[in-house]
Amino acid sequence: MNDVVLSRRQLLALAAASLIPDAATADLYDEYINSTSKQPVVAFLARKGVPGHAFVGIGVRLEAGLTVYERFFGYYPAASGTASEVKLVFGKVSGALDYKWKDTAWDEAYVVQVDDARKASAIAVADKWKGADPKYNLFASGGKNCSTFASEVAAAVGLKAPSGAGSMLPASYIEKLKKANGAP
């Protein structure tokens, strides 16, 4: 019961932040709760720019075609500031698997329907990264970055993950991931 209440609070907070009218918020919640078909999905998402950012959304697609994301995971440098920025280019810094509000917007997306076991595999990769920080490096030189996280999740759910994820801009990596798996 607590999971349902927590999910409802999260869903309503997201809806309120998106400036959805009150009636639509209730409809969205009802659509999610009353859905008879919740097909698990894993989404590989990226924002363009330099350096950009790749992240993973995990959720369900309802029978009405609406995708509801239950979790977002992005790998970020844990610290900020000039010294940290220099170090993350030339060395390794502590990283953090986290969710940020800006992870609700993306320029590139590859959404894959999966079964419950593959959804659990995606979550297991996130749990592994949360439990043992692999160390962040912008170019994945001796460390890992947001694109390598997306690549590990892709492999865990059975996708063909292109090599060199850490050395590509995130949006470019998601484009290559789509092409490698036959998506337009």
Predicted features by range, described:
Residues 44-45, 106-114, 133-141:
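Second-shell loop/turn segments in exported
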Residues 27-108:
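Glycine-rich catalytic cores of cysteine/serine-nucleophile enzymes that process amide/ester linkages
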Residues 38, 123-184:
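Activation targets extended, charge/polar-rich intrinsically disordered C-terminal tails
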Residues 114-126:
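A structural motif
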Residues 2-16:
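N-terminal secretory signal peptides and thylakoid transit peptides that target proteins
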